Amino acid sequence: MNREVVTMSTGNTLPPALAALASPLNDAQLNQLQQTVTQLNAQQLAWVSGYFWGLSQSNALSVPHISAGQTASAASGKLTIIFASQTGNAKGVAQALLKEAQAAGIQAQLFDASDYKGKDLAKETHVIFVASTNGEGEAPDNALALHEFLKSKKAPKLPNLKYGVLGLGDSSYQFFCQTGKDFDQFLENLGAQRLVERLDADVDYQAAATEWRKQVLSILKDELTGAAAVTSVATFAVSQTAESHYSKEQPYTASLSTSQKITGRDSGKDVRHIEIDLADSGITYQPGDALGVWYENRPQLVNALLDSVGLSGHEEVQVDGETLSLHSALTHHYEITAANPQLVAQFAELAQSEKLTSLAQDKEALREYATRTQVIDVLREEKVTLSAIQLLSLLRRLTPRLYSIASSQSEVGEEVHLTVGVVEYEYKGEQRLGGASSFLAHQLEEGAPVKVFVEHNNNFKLPSDDNAPLIMVGPGTGIAPFRSFIQERENRGAAGKNWLLFGDRTFTQDFLYQVEWQKYLKSGVLNRLDVAFSRDQHEKVYVQHRLLDQAELVWQWLQEGAYFYVCGDASRMAKDVHQALITVVEQQGGLNREQAEEYVSELRKAKRYQRDVY
């Protein structure tokens, strides 16, 4: 992930912007600082600047005042950037905008939405929101309170505010960029003026986001001038996990240590326990974080795709300014597995397909079709010959897959573990495989290189209080982060109670990490384990049913301050568990439905109800 930094130069003297300040340091301190600075490279300076800022915030130190005479010219205003992010993409875009604003001499500040008070918008002149969308159109957890405030009657009128919104989402889903659309509408309703039109960016958002930021900055240069970039600092707290310089854009080349199937021979699922060696990388992570994995497309799929549109793969194409063969571009740079509605609609027009054109006019049918097909299936709907440029114009750029980390570093050291469900099904008699999951499970041999990075997730974290009880709901591969939670709690010697609810199809074939859970039960680290195997009896039973079965105990734990976690499928499981939790609160707390919903909402705001759903 990118870190917000205050840019400093290297060399034998202090950076000019720093030297220009009325220094609060004595001569000895200045000399010591200068000697240290000259020994650091640009990357180290960037880290140190963020670290010292975090210290200054935690110790409530003030930033030195800069008078008009100490800067080139006084600022006519400042830019406030607010990010609403679930997995880190929106945060990364917001940090990039901050750096670019600083470089342009614009005074700017960056806020995590959870740290920003909505009423303070009345004091702002220029605000940019960068917002991702969680689940089925929900605001990310860090933006729930701000989202609720801005749509309430408590929100202030904002006639003096100019704003812009960049939404991130996936057009495959019905509520594409819904959180960005919400913030845009809220601000308009409050009388704010759009600085720039909202951008609804898809999965491959990088190029569109870069152009949008350029547009924003070209406007802001005329309206916000003169502030020294060194005064622009992020106000969100420095993470407890030191951020490495490896990121989505600059991943670390690790190696695959283990890929072990952990479902039974007769299971209908192929779930893998993956271990990746991070030795000498310096990468650190916390329970709740995710690992980003860059993958390569299967040669067989690339060849089939080329054959379907009459291309050889030897054609030369330009990718990011580099000349590549089409085969190489499809292998390393383009998404050729999952279909999406935009692909279907564009191919329908290009191929003049009546069938696909008719389908594209029905949004619900289009989404359903795109969900169950892959790119190759769409291209085979019509026999057409495409040019290399036409083919690439249909495709999204390849993006890494994020997997919930299934290990604690206090337990495994310089390794990271994943629990990966291999996507595998048949379509019209042919096998279809997921891109990243099949890469990890089938393409890579042990010892092979794999490019990875850590995506920190501050919205899914263990409580700082080791005495707090935990209730963890993780069916299927949703069990992954709770393996890391339990490992961490054991290594910390945490006294808090731990309760795990796991579900899958059958006890004998699909009980993931069964031996480990039994060990933790025996040792007392895990206080309770409830399981729901849906196909082991005539009537299907799921984790939400187990919650309702134990409603009295769930309520008791909540009253004792328990934290409630859910990981796994967003489309059905997470919704059903959410409704079951409300029912538990309603029945056991003696509340009506509306009051129970408010209680659960307050749990989320207090970060005692956290979800990692997908």
Swiss-Prot record:
GO biological process annotation, one example: hydrogen sulfide biosynthetic process
Binding-site positions, NADP(+): S534, R535, K540, V541, Y542, V543, Q544, D576
Leader sequence segment: none
EC assignment: 1.8.1.2
Binding site for FMN: 85-90, 132-135, 168-177
Binding site for FAD: 337, 371, 401-404, 419-421, 425, 434-437, 614
Disulfide bonds, paired cysteine numbers: none
Reactions catalysed according to its record: hydrogen sulfide + 3 NADP(+) + 3 H2O = sulfite + 3 NADPH + 4 H(+)
Subunit annotation: Alpha(8)-beta(8). The alpha component is a flavoprotein, the beta component is a hemoprotein.
Recorded family membership: Belongs to the NADPH-dependent sulphite reductase flavoprotein subunit CysJ family.
CDD domains given in the database record: SiR (cd06199)
Pathway(s) of this molecule: Sulfur metabolism; hydrogen sulfide biosynthesis; hydrogen sulfide from sulfite (NADPH route): step 1/1
Segments crossing the lipid bilayer: none
The name this protein goes by in its record: Sulfite reductase [NADPH] flavoprotein alpha-component
Cofactor requirements of the protein: FAD; FMN
Keyword Electron transport in annotation: yes
Domain of life of the native organism: Bacteria
Pfam families: FAD_binding_1, Flavodoxin_1, NAD_binding_1
Keyword Electron transport among record annotations: yes
Residues in FAD-binding FR-type domain copies: 249-463
Coiled coil: none
